[in-house]
Swiss-Prot record:
It is found in: Membrane. The chain crosses the membrane at residues 33-53. This is Small integral membrane protein 39. Its main location: membrane. Keywords: Membrane, Transmembrane, Transmembrane helix. It is a single-pass membrane protein. One of its GO terms (cellular component) is membrane. The gene is SMIM39.
Length: 56
């Protein structure tokens, strides 16, 4: 039985996008790869920003 779509209230939180990504039909190995890639990308962005702020 399909549920009616819920009305969206306000902006989506960042955690909701991650939960929606994890709810899709990926095998567990692919989910781990996707999560690892996203975390590695966030770490890389943080390192670049730290270097840019440190060596201005």
């Amino acid at each position: 039985m399909a549920r009616a779509p819920q009305p969206r209230r306000g902006p989506a939180a960042p955690g909701n996008a991650l939960r929606a990504l994890l709810r899709c039909n990926l095998p567990p190995g692919a989910q781990r790869v996707v999560v690892s890639a996203v975390l590695a990308l966030l770490v890389l962005i943080n390192v670049v920003l730290i270097f840019l702020l440190a060596f201005r």
